[in-house]
């Protein structure tokens, strides 16, 4: 956008009518020192050819706070110097001369307390379609403690969940029922029973199983909870199955959640695509009803995967922790879905840290104090199997749910054998780690030793032991070690 030239050499004043450059309207301040109470955002921007990156950064700050395309006299009726967002730093992205990192500070008073919907309406509501910018991606955010404290956060959290399940010192195990569409309620319940009886802690609905002609939601809930209760009685362990309450209206979702509660379920599930207001509402319901809330990140790849445009999943994970989910899918790094190992570990930091430290190699550009919000249990799911157990535990530690869907239900000896294979592999690896062995390097040997005494594990390793998904990740961390303000 080209601003008019000054008339007869006279400099334009801030509130003269007409179009001005954003950086001249106060949306760029290279000397600005962010305050502890500022909300900070890092954008990756690709300006149009010929557009000054500083002007592009100022435009992002302006269009995500108080600016419009022309000077408006009503600015003078506000405390506009405070309400203007301020771009304060621009760095070139390494090895990409067209892209720039721009840092923007927002005054806390610009945002409604405890509302992710309001936050996202400002930060991503308008700037991503702004013509002077070819592409924009929200890479990271820092929330001030005062803002974090306006959110309730997870209703259960990792510690309380483990206490309810009475399971400590190891990752939890789960599986998604497959095929995810087409089973009758009775057959669906049978799959759940076999998986839980074989040694899994959880079974799970997939993202698109709701209430279809082949299986009404009420039938699924009834057969699943019958399976959960029978498996719990048979094993002496607390078991659960994520019942997906996603529906077309909020009222229907509450109705399904209430029915799940009446059947004794300990956990329900919603999809990311239901939206932020719905997610926060279901979190509040779970808090009031002592339920765990699992979040399936359905649809996230439409805006998180591309490196030059969209929203990084680390930002989505931060919003979800504020919104109050107890579980969220965060990637596997070794499975079938997109995920650079270091970047994925950064997502796990966001879920589990009390205080997240800046770590540029993991894509974490800001320190974040979580102000005593409970921690989210990350979930690794998608194309993983027992032969990768050493890699998964080395990458993610104990506080994670490892979900083996096809790696359980596709077992050549049946579903219960698949679950047993995963449980034995997990127990063997945790034991070896606790004995001080190098499980990352000795993992295959540890698994083969355990398989000598476990036929299901031996069959799993013979079937999938050499299966890997070695593709180059599209979303990796870029960073600038030192500032180079334009």
Swiss-Prot record:
Binding of substrate, residues: 126, 176, 180, 297, 329, 381
The miscellaneous annotation reads: The basic functional RuBisCO is composed of a large chain homodimer in a 'head-to-tail' conformation. In form I RuBisCO this homodimer is arranged in a barrel-like tetramer with the small subunits forming a tetrameric 'cap' on each end of the 'barrel'.
For this UniProt entry, the molecular function terms from Gene Ontology, in alphabetical order, are: magnesium ion binding; monooxygenase activity; ribulose-bisphosphate carboxylase activity
Catalytic center residues: 178, 296
HAMAP family assigned: RuBisCO_L_type1 (MF_01338)
Q: By its UniProt entry, which CDD domains does this protein fall under?
A: RuBisCO_large_I (cd08212)
Instruction: Read off the PROSITE patterns from this record.
Output: RUBISCO_LARGE
Q: Which gene encodes it?
A: cbbL
Q: Give the cofactor binding note.
A: Binds 1 Mg(2+) ion per subunit.
Cofactor(s) of this protein: Mg(2+)
Protein's name according to its UniProt entry = Ribulose bisphosphate carboxylase large chain
Q: Which organism is it from?
A: Cupriavidus taiwanensis (strain DSM 17343 / BCRC 17206 / CCUG 44338 / CIP 107171 / LMG 19424 / R1) (Ralstonia taiwanensis (strain LMG 19424))
Role, per record: RuBisCO catalyzes two reactions: the carboxylation of D-ribulose 1,5-bisphosphate, the primary event in carbon dioxide fixation, as well as the oxidative fragmentation of the pentose substrate. Both reactions occur simultaneously and in competition at the same active site.
Cite the position(s) of the site with description Transition state stabilizer.
Answer: 336
So where does Mg(2+) get bound?
A: 204, 206-207
The protein's assembly and partners: Heterohexadecamer of 8 large chains and 8 small chains.
Which reaction equation describes what this protein catalyses?
Answer: 2 (2R)-3-phosphoglycerate + 2 H(+) = D-ribulose 1,5-bisphosphate + CO2 + H2O; D-ribulose 1,5-bisphosphate + O2 = 2-phosphoglycolate + (2R)-3-phosphoglycerate + 2 H(+)
User: Which residues, renumbered to this chain, carry the PTM N6-carboxylysine?
Assistant: 204
Respond yes or no to whether keyword Magnesium is given for this record: yes
Q: Which UniProt keywords apply?
A: Calvin cycle, Carbon dioxide fixation, Lyase, Magnesium, Metal-binding, Monooxygenase, Oxidoreductase
Q: Which family does it belong to?
A: Belongs to the RuBisCO large chain family. Type I subfamily.
Q: Which InterPro entries match?
A: RuBisCO, RuBisCo_large_chain_AS, RuBisCO_lsu_C, RuBisCO_lsu_C_sf, RuBisCO_lsu_fd_N, RuBisCO_lsu_N_sf, RuBisCO_lsuI
Name a single GO biological process: reductive pentose-phosphate cycle
Q: What is its EC number?
A: 4.1.1.39
């Amino acid at each position: 956008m080209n601003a008019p030239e000054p008339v007869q050499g006279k400099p334009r004043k801030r509130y003269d009518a007409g179009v001005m450059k954003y950086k001249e309207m106060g949306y760029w301040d290279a000397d600005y020192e962010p305050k502890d109470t500022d909300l900070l955002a890092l954008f990756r921007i690709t300006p149009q050819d010929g557009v000054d990156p500083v002007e592009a950064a100022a435009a992002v700050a302006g269009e995500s706070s108080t600016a419009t395309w022309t000077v408006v006299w009503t600015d003078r009726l506000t405390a506009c110097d405070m309400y203007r967002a301020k771009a304060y730093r621009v760095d070139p992205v390494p090895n990409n001369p067209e892209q720039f990192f721009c840092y923007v500070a927002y005054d806390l008073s610009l945002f409604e307390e405890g509302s992710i919907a309001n936050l996202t309406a400002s930060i991503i509501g308008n700037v991503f379609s702004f013509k002077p910018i070819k592409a924009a991606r929200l890479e990271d955010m820092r929330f001030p403690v005062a803002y974090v404290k306006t959110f309730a956060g997870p209703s259960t959290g990792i510690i309380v969940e483990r206490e309810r399940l009475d399971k400590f010192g190891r990752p939890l195990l789960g599986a998604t029922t497959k095929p995810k569409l087409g089973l009758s309620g009775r057959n669906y319940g049978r799959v759940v029973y076999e998986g839980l009886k074989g040694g899994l802690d959880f079974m799970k609905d997939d993202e698109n199983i709701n209430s279809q002609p082949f299986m009404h939601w009420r039938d699924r809930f009834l057969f699943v909870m019958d399976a959960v209760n029978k498996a719990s009685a048979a094993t002496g362990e607390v078991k659960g199955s994520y019942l997906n309450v996603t529906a077309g209206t909020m009222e229907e979702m509450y109705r399904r959640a209430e029915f799940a509660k009446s059947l004794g379920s300990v956990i329900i599930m919603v999809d990311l695509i239901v939206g932020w207001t719905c997610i926060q509402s279901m979190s509040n319901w779970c808090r009031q009803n002592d339920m765990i809330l699992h979040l399936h990140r359905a649809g996230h790849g439409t805006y998180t995967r591309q490196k030059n445009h969209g929203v990084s999943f680390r930002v989505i994970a931060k919003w979800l922790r504020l919104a109050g989910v107890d579980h969220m899918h965060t990637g596997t790094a070794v499975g079938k879905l997109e995920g650079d190992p270091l970047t994925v570990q950064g997502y796990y930091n966001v879920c589990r840290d009390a205080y997240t430290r800046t770590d540029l190699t993991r894509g974490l550009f800001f320190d974040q104090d979580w102000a005593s919000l409970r921690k989210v249990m990350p979930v690794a799911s998608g194309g993983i199997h027992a032969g990768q157990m050493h890699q998964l535990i080395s990458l993610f530690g104990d506080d994670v749910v490892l979900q083996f869907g096809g790696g359980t239900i596709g077992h050549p000896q049946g579903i219960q054998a698949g679950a047993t294979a995963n449980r034995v592999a997990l127990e063997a690896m945790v034991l070896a780690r606790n004995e001080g062995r190098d499980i990352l390097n000795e993992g295959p040997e540890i698994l083969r030793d355990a398989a000598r005494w476990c036929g299901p594990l031996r069959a799993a390793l013979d079937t999938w032991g050499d299966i890997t998904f070695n593709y180059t990740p599209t979303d990796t961390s870029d960073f600038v070690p030192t500032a180079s303000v334009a």
